[in-house]
């Protein structure tokens, strides 16, 4: 009875299971995956490494990074920009050189045409030039002119049509045997790269001086634990992935957002060091992940080329 498993793909219908299996192996089709809790970072972890930060910093959009990881990312972006800029400058130099060559060839062709016109001008007065055949006529040199054939061609369709194709393709004649007449792929032109450094998560421009140091308040007894816990320095409540938190620029601390709404917005003073604050001195932290679809986006999608079956 083990032979039934060997013939699982012998059906005449391309099943859904076979399509999914072939899509994973062939590199075609969009892939979907359900992310678990281990694939989603916590609120105090780095957004790049998904690991606890040794030297945490925060971006203007509220994402937490490890200083070492974000510096390596910024350096990699600058190296990629320098590489793309060299390729773009090389393309511009090649285009300018090709334009100069084409201009020189056009000038040479113009001079040759003018010289040929001067040489073909009759020097004797009364000389008669040989008449040239009309363009598009069906007159054979040295033969008999047939006006009936030309009338039939005009009656059947447009002049200059080389095939039964319509539109612009009707006047073109591609040939498999002649390389010059075969359609070729045109090389895509490179656009000038942008020198802006972007945040790897939000995609917005970011500067190194905009990254601010973060001081989390650890919960007593968890300083040396594998999974450290942190609390709000004002309310002394535990901060979790579902807690709405805010970063205070004056004291570099992370507090619950209830502190901002109930204390800071009314008094305009940092409750930790007593310095005056404004709304620009408050950054809302991006929340961490819980692994539940009701709270976070737990589905990942990878878009790849689609496999078309005839």
Curated annotation (Swiss-Prot):
- The residue ranges flagged as biased composition, category Polar residues, are 115-124
Question: One matching Pfam family, short form?
Answer: zf-NOSIP
Keywords, in A-Z order: Cytoplasm, Nucleus
The record's subcellular location field reads:
Cytoplasm; Nucleus
| GO cellular component entries | cytoplasm; nucleus
Q: Where is this region: Disordered?
A: 115-141
Highest taxon, organism lineage: Eukaryota
Molecular function GO terms recorded = ubiquitin protein ligase activity
Question: Does the entry annotate any disulfide bonds, and if so which pairs?
Answer: none
Annotated signal sequence is: none
Q: Which family does it belong to?
A: Belongs to the NOSIP family.
**Function of this protein?**
Negatively regulates nitric oxide production by inducing nitric oxide synthase translocation to actin cytoskeleton and inhibiting its enzymatic activity.
Protein name as it appears in the record: Nitric oxide synthase-interacting protein homolog
Q: Which organism is it from?
A: Caenorhabditis elegans
């Amino acid at each position: 009875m083990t032979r039934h498993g060997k013939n699982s793909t012998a059906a005449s219908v391309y099943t859904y299971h076979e399509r999914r299996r072939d899509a994973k192996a062939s590199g075609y089709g969009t892939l979907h995956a359900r992310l678990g809790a281990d694939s989603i970072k916590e609120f105090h972890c780095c957004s790049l490494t998904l690991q606890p930060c040794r030297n945490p910093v925060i971006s203007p959009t509220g994402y937490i990074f490890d200083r070492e990881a974000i510096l390596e990312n910024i350096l990699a972006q600058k190296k990629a920009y320098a590489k793309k800029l060299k390729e773009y400058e090389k393309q511009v130099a090649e285009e300018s050189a090709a334009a100069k060559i084409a201009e020189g060839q056009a000038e040479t062709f113009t001079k040759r045409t003018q010289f040929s016109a001067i040489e073909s001008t009759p020097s004797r007065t009364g000389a008669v030039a040989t008449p040239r055949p009309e363009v598009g006529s069906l007159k054979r040199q040295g033969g008999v002119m047939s006006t009936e054939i030309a009338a039939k061609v005009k009656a059947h369709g447009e002049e200059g049509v080389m095939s039964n194709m319509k539109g612009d393709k009707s006047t073109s004649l591609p040939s498999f045997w002649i390389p010059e007449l075969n359609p070729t792929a045109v090389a895509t032109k490179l656009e000038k790269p942008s020198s802006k450094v972007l945040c790897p998560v939000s995609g917005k421009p970011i500067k190194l001086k905009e990254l601010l140091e973060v001081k989390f308040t650890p919960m007593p007894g968890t300083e040396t634990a594998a999974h450290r816990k942190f609390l709000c320095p004002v309310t002394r409540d535990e901060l979790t992935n579902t807690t709405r938190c805010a970063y205070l620029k004056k004291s570099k601390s992370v507090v619950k957002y209830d502190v901002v709404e109930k204390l800071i917005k009314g008094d305009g003073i940092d409750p930790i060091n007593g310095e005056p604050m404004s709304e620009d001195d408050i950054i809302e932290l991006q929340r961490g992940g819980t692994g539940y679809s009701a709270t976070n986006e737990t589905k990942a999608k990878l878009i790849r080329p689609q496999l078309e079956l005839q």
